[in-house]
Amino acid sequence: MSKLDLNALNELPKVDRILALAETNAELEKLDAEGRVAWALDNLPGEYVLSSSFGIQAAVSLHLVNQIHPDIPVILTDTGYLFPETYRFIDELTDKLKLNLKVYRATESAAWQEARYGKLWEQGVEGIEKYNDINKVEPMNRALKELNAQTWFAGLRREQSGSRANLPVLAIQRGVFKVLPIIDWDNRTIYQYLQKHGLKYHPLWDDGYLSVGDTHTTRKWEPGMAEEETRFFGLKRECGLHEG
């Protein structure tokens, strides 16, 4: 696999970019997660960043990538509506793993947003998408720009939802390379990694949560529900960061 030219790939239409990366992705599918991270660091341009929502299984990708590339900037987009358990989990993992945490927030505070727009998450898909644009997408775009990111690692997995089922290891999103080292891991592999390295699930895992985001758009899992139905009232799975 040869080095890739980000500028040249960004000039291509989306379909052509996918085709241009197809051969590389076929080879990356053969590597394990650590091998994918190592390949990306050797062959893709820096600066490098890792995003995390500090969700249920977040410790895996945080530990895996940080072990190979210590001090990598870890981007968190904080909406101001995370669970108290999430904020404590962020503190715990940041200390335990010595993370280089970079927190980005909307330019409008949560209270100001509610005063201006009402509770956007109660206004259907359109309201949720506006909420996500303000609190997730714009802060992430700002983070990528301010950190001069050219390669972005994330912990998405195909097993998590239908919208992620066909994602490749390597893609281009928001003008940068995006690498998903654990994309093909199943829940058993996640568990084994956590056990091997003395890591924990998010505290709300024990309370029946399979996925954790904001307090007002996250539900406990109930029998018969798909994991993606526990977020955004089942109206959508993605918060916007991993779309586009």
From Swiss-Prot:
It is found in: Cytoplasm. Pathway: Sulfur metabolism; hydrogen sulfide biosynthesis; sulfite from sulfate: step 3/3. One of its GO terms (molecular function) is phosphoadenylyl-sulfate reductase (thioredoxin) activity. Belongs to the PAPS reductase family. CysH subfamily. The keyword RNA-binding does not apply. It catalyses: [thioredoxin]-disulfide + sulfite + adenosine 3',5'-bisphosphate + 2 H(+) = [thioredoxin]-dithiol + 3'-phosphoadenylyl sulfate. CDD domains: PAPS_reductase (cd23945). Pfam families: PAPS_reduct. InterPro entries: PAPS/APS_Rdtase, PAPS_reduct_dom, PAPS_reductase_CysH, Rossmann-like_a/b/a_fold. The active site is at residue 239. Catalyzes the formation of sulfite from phosphoadenosine 5'-phosphosulfate (PAPS) using thioredoxin as an electron donor. This is Phosphoadenosine 5'-phosphosulfate reductase. Its EC number is 1.8.4.8. Keywords: Cytoplasm, Oxidoreductase. It is an enzyme of class 1 (oxidoreductase). Its main location: cytoplasm.
